[in-house]
Structure formats: C-alpha cells, structure tokens
Amino acid sequence: MNLKSHLTDIVEPDFGLLDELLSLHVLTLHELADVRSERTVYKRNNALLELLTTEDQCDKFVTTLKRTDQQHVMNYITQNGGQKHYGIVTLSVMLN
C-alpha cells in the first residue's frame, strides 16, 4: 500500500482539518466545498490529497495534522516514505 492510499484511510478531515487548511489558504472556499461534498471519508481524503500539489501546501498539511490532534498521521508520514529534511516533511512528490 502506498503512502497516499494509506493516508486516505487514516486522516480525519471532518473535525477541524479542512477549516484549518482553509484558514491557511491551502484550500479555497470552492475547493473546501468540493472536498466536503464527497460522500465518504475515504473520498474526502482522496479529494483533499489531490489538491496538495506544492511543497508549501504539503508542509501546511503536515503542520495542520499536528494542530488537529492527528500527530499519529504525521508520525506515519515521516516513518513510512516521507522525507524529513530541515524539520519539514516533503510529501508532495509521494502524493502525486
């Protein structure tokens, strides 16, 4: 199972993550609405991950995981394919 596939299973988007990503300008209102319109958590996560296309967006995503009590997801990223350099996690290459 690749990193993106596993993240679609373990990220919890519905309790603060999406709103925080909106406030950090990672998502636009339109993108937020599109993600939220997906019927299942798996599909919401997949839609969200598809929108993370830059290193800056991925860095903010990882930071937001920590802020929304999803440290276990951040730990999974850094231990299973995420490249930890200079205190950041680079996962944009792995998500695409």
Regions found by a protein language model. Give the residues of each.
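Death-fold homotypic interaction modules
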Residues: 1-96
